[in-house]
Each structure stands twice: as C-alpha cells, then as structure tokens.
Amino acid sequence: MEERKKKFVQGESSISEAGSSGLFAPNSMAIAFTGKPLTALANTRTIGVRDSLSKTALSVEDITIYAENGASSLGVGEHKILMAGVSAFTEKNGTRDKKPDLRVSFDFMNYAKACGVEVEAKTMSTPEEQAKEDERALTAIKHFQQKLRENCKNLMHTSINWTERINRKEAAYNGMVFISAYRITSKTITLEFSLSAADYMVQLPQTTRPIALYGIDDRKYNAYSIGCYLSAHYAMNQNVMAGTENLLRVENILKKTKLPTKEEMVQSKSHRTWIGRAKEPFEEALDELKRCGLLSDWYYSHSKGIPLSDEEASAIDSYEEWSQLLLCFEVANFRPRAERRALIEAKKEKTKAKKEETKASTKSRKRKTKSKASEA
C-alpha cells in the first residue's frame, strides 16, 4: 500500500487523466462540503508552538493542527488546493447514496488560470517574441506545478484534532489527515482523500463557494481570510432569510486576520497609528477582493445597510469606534436576494412534504402490520 501511494505521489501511476473540466469557470460558483476544520484553516491568525513530538502545533478556532517537517503554518496555497479538492469531491459524492470515491481529478490549466497564473502563451507578432512567450508559459507551468506539489506535501504531513457537532451529536476527531496522496501533471491535478476524511465530509452540509476566491494573491493572506469569511456568511440560508447576509461587524472580520486586535494595539511599541496598522490594511484587503472579482461593492454602514455619510466616516477617530462599525458588502455572481429566498422557501416546502409523506407511509405500514397480526 505504501509503495502504491509513493508512486502515486511521485506521478508514476497510470491513473486516469479524466477530471472536472468545468469546475473553475470564471464568474461561477462551486458547491463544497463545509465543516469546522475546512473553514478554520482559512483563518490566518495561528499560534505556532512546539510539542514533545517535535511537530509544529497550530491552534486556531478551537482546532489543533499538527504539521510535520517543521512547517510553522498552512498558507493560502494549501487551503486553495484543499478546497478545490473538496469541491471536486462534493461534485462526485454529494448525493450521499453510495460509498464515497476517495479520488478526485480536475483540470490543471483551468485551476491555474483560476488562481491568476498566466499558463497560456499569448500570440505574439514575431517568431522570436513567440518563442520567448512560449518559454515563459512553460516556465510558469513548471513553477506552478512545483508550488502545488509543495502545497499537497504540506497537507499530507498535516493532521488535525477537533470536536464538532455532527447530526446533532458531538464528535471528536483526532489525527485526521485530509489528503493521503496526490498527482500533479500538466493536464490534471489528482487528489486522494483519506477514508476518515471522506466519511467525515459526506456527513456535512454543503455551501456555495465563489471561484473568485482562487484569484486572490497567495501573499495577501488577510484578503483571502476575509474573502472566505464574507462569502461563507453571504451563502448561509439563515442570513439570507434574515436579510443580514451582506452585513458583518468589522470587529468580527478582524478576528479572521493577522491585523492587530485592540489588546495588541495597546501592548505594541510601534509608533504607527491604528489607521496605518489596522484600518488601511483592512481596506486594502477589501479592495483586493474587488480586484479579483469576489466583491462587487463594500462600504461602512449603519444597522440596516445604510451607508455612513462622509461626515460620519471622517468623524471616526479611534480603533474602538471603527471596529464597531458594520461592513456592508455584496459578493458578486450570487442570485438576487429575492430569488434566493424563493429557492430556500421552495426547498423547505419540498423537505416538509417529503417528511409528511414518509410519516404517512410509516403509519400505513404500521396499520397493515397490526391488521395482519389481528387476522393471525
């Protein structure tokens, strides 16, 4: 088994090249299972310490991550490829009516382009320029392949401990590894999930995940964490029905980033103001989300999404006051709120009708069983 896995990781296996070619279409959405570790790993506020096993222990959002080989954290690249695999896994196993298929494949070029990597050679005006452009594209492909292999290797050497309520029961997970094997070629990315990860994921609810998240620069980790948090909040049905899917308090968003908290601002010896250390980087991250096409708009607002006036915005002169503001935002490419509400209501009615049908069928079977018993 170990030998087979080794060959698979090194790209020597003869597995199929078939993949999910339409998974990363621009301006589209993907469906993905969503659970505690999958969302927590997008949070960049991690604390690195050493334990007795010489592994790196990272604590974030009540989960503990153990990374071998001295890795101090999991970056944006690791979370992107993991969630790409989860989306492909959801597409393949989302019906939950059969034993999950652990192996998923998707198109390398489509994924690279979704991540903003220019892997296709442009048409140039001269043979010399074309040769240089072809070489540039080939180099970009090789570098991205190398990066993906490093991302997948980090995930393979990462185990996670956490507790989570699944199907109304509290469950404890220890030492779970999500990715057990991988293969990267110039055509296909193939990931193999561990059996324990697959069994866990098929119990989870599904969410809508914008493809635009992959276009965020890997180095802009605050923007990525914020983007994941805003899009997850925007996709929740209960938020849509309450009319709050596009509103979040700045203070809560900051908790998902490495930007300084109020306590860190007080303790710091930096001479930079709260505006330069927190507000400006926060707004730069939001602008990055507009640049990559995730957000169509954002602004500070009052409780019902009413924008702050210029006078109100300029009057804010402290970190405390700024962090209590609401951020109003719109995630691009989602259906309008009214349409989303109608779909949610229709799904509720369908679920209700199915439950009533099941209940009636159960009663009917009991009556027939009772009748047969009486005749006997």
Question: Predicted regions: what is each one?
Answer:
Residues 1-376:
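Charged, alpha-helix-forming regions
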